[in-house]
């Protein structure tokens, strides 16, 4: 949704800029005239690279581009405009007439490019001076192709340039469209209705509230987006805070404190496996010998305790009786479950023998 809102705001800004701006005619920009003059020089220089340039079979009529500056200043603006429009129109007709006399040659290609530049100049002047029918001016006949390119250059440097430098500012202000004032409060819905029908439905659905200006709407959107950033950061921090809890659970499961394992195995403590039925206590390691009391503070070498051991209590020393007692000896009285079990087992063996 944020991307859609951003695109709509950009569209509104572009629409407002196109509506409020008053584009001046191309002729009011002197860079256009400078570019046309540079391009005409480039075309004229390429003419010398053509292999064969012959005079035209039939002379063409070209406008008279020479003028007197003093006489030019005394003329009215309308007379100057009609004179320039007539000269450019005659030049375009002369270029097309000269090209029609040639076949597909290098000169014909250059004349085609020159006609495009003349059309561009004529369109720019008509947007500034109007499209009234210009009167016929003075003309001269020429057969030399170089005269066509030179006429265009002299026209740009002379009459057109002086027209724009002297009275161009007045003409540009007169021909510029009036600017429309922007109301202090503009509804976004009303502005969006002026857009094409494809986007009007989407814009009316997404935006039902009005804003004062398009700039304030963009500012509110940025503030709303910034307000969402702390919430995203809080969610991330909460997720990070849950990680230690999962680690503690895993640690407890591995240590066997959840009831999954009764305790550390003999392999964990380093004790070897003892097969069932083996009663040789001499082969047992020291930590499994009867009467061995491990130190809670100093475990044996190579062994580690996972949890602190409780305080050691005095362990009674248990003496094992032989499996086959002497029948003449008095029967001992068992004092513990372990002695009782060994005594019963010895009696069973003696009866079987």
From Swiss-Prot:
It is linked to Thrombocythemia 1: A myeloproliferative disorder characterized by excessive platelet production, resulting in increased numbers of circulating platelets. It can be associated with spontaneous hemorrhages and thrombotic episodes. GO terms for molecular function: cytokine activity; growth factor activity; hormone activity; signaling receptor binding. Residues 324-335 have a biased composition (Pro residues). Glycans are attached at residues 22, 58, 131, 179-180, 184, 197, 206, 213, 234, 255, 265, 340, 348. GO terms for biological process: cell population proliferation; cell surface receptor signaling pathway via STAT; megakaryocyte development; megakaryocyte differentiation; positive regulation of cell population proliferation; positive regulation of ERK1 and ERK2 cascade; positive regulation of hematopoietic stem cell proliferation; positive regulation of MAPK cascade. This is Thrombopoietin. It comes from Homo sapiens. It is found in: Secreted. Two-domain structure with an erythropoietin-like N-terminal and a Ser/Pro/Thr-rich C-terminal. Belongs to the EPO/TPO family. Residues 257-353 are annotated as: Disordered. Interacts with MPL/TPOR. One of its GO terms (cellular component) is extracellular space. Residues 275-304, 343-353 have a biased composition (Polar residues). Keywords: Cytokine, Disease variant, Disulfide bond, Glycoprotein, Hormone, Secreted, Signal. Disulfide bonds join 28-172, 50-106. Lineage-specific cytokine affecting the proliferation and maturation of megakaryocytes from their committed progenitor cells. It acts at a late stage of megakaryocyte development. It may be the major physiological regulator of circulating platelets. Residues 1-21 form the signal peptide.
